[in-house]
Amino acid sequence: MNKIINIGLTALFACFMVACENDIDNYDAPNGGVHGTIYDKETNEPIPMPVPGSSGVMMSLYEQNTGATASVDFRARQDGTFEHTKVFNGNYRIQAKDGPFVGVCEGYVTVNGQTQVDLYTIPFSRISLDVTVSADNKLTLTYDAKTSNETLQLTDVSVIWNYAPGVDVNNANHATFSS
């Protein structure tokens, strides 16, 4: 009985090994990629993004002229840059979704190797911050917060900080100011 089980297991193992060496996957690995920055259309400054992760800005690549309906998704970084290094060469529409900007943020790119594509849009607001630290380690903050569009209204401005990079409202210390 053991001999039959051993022969069966050996045959099963041989089938698994042969299955791993077939030519079913006949596509070469992706040979292109995209990288770039999302800029403020009016100031040419990078637009800060939410912390990457489940709450970060989703970047989506839609392949054009192939009938493909699914997108290739990845996240933008907090400094407004983005990168995906494993994309097939071809024509794509790239879109930033659910970001801190007004309207649609998208562009078109022909990927041929590692390709740079920068996107330009209008942010919801422009916030400048000046921080000074006194000799006794006290912070003085001066900020200016303006909306980019008269129809938008700022209702709350918060200063948040953390000891590690990647601060957001879920992992920060807060100081809220009324305007």
Q: Which residues does each predicted region cover?
A:
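Short, acidic Ser/Thr/Gly-rich low-complexity loop/linker segments typical of extracellular
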Residues: 63-79
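Structural beta-strand segments of beta-rich domains
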Residues: 30-34, 137-141
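C-terminal motif of bacterial Sec signal peptides marking the signal peptidase cleavage site
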Residues: 16-19
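Short, ordered, surface-exposed loop/turn motifs in non-cytosolic proteins
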Residues: 43-67, 152-157
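Bacterial signal peptide processing site
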Residues: 21-24
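A short, solvent-exposed beta-strand micro-motif common in secreted/extracellular proteins
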Residues: 80-84, 90-101
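Structured interaction patches on ligand/partner-binding surfaces of diverse proteins
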Residues: 98-125
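A short, amphipathic beta-strand motif
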Residues: 32-41, 80
